[in-house]
Amino acid sequence: MMMPLTCNVLEKLSGKTLCTAESCTGGGIGAALTAVPGSSEVYKGGIISYTNDVKQKLLGINPFLLKNLGAVSAPIAEAMAIGARNALNTDIAVSVTGLAGPGGDDKGNPVGLVFIGYADDKRITSRRFVFSGDREEVRNQAVEAALKLILDLN
C-alpha cells in the first residue's frame, strides 16, 4: 500500500541521509522505509520516543516545554526532529507526535491530532493533522503523511 510512496521518498533522497523520531507511530515510518531493499543507503535509523522521559533523554527535549506545551504540539515535533538529526547525524529528520487513541490527553487535545516535524540544514518546520479512524488507522495515516511531507520538502 505505501510501498510506491516509500520508494519515491528513498529515490528522491538519494545521496542524502534520513532518520526518524517517532512517538505515536511506534516505528511505523522506519518499518515502511526498511521494507524497501537498499533503504540503508538513505535511512540511518530512528528513535522511538514513546514517553516524555525518552524524549528528554535521547532527543534532548526541554522538560519545561513538555510540561507546558504537552508532548503533542508543533514545537515538540520540531524539537524531536532536531534532536534526532543531531543524535543520528543525518541530513534530514522527520518526527511524529500525536494521539492515536483511544483517549485524548490532559491538554484537551483530541484523538487523531498529530504533528509531524521536519528538520534539515535549511529549515525546521512542522505540520498539524487531525486524522479520523481507530488507533491503527490514525497511525497509518500519520506514517503516510510523514512520507508525503518528506517528498513535499525535497
Label each region the model flagged.
Residues M1-N154:
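Short alpha-helical segments enriched in small residues
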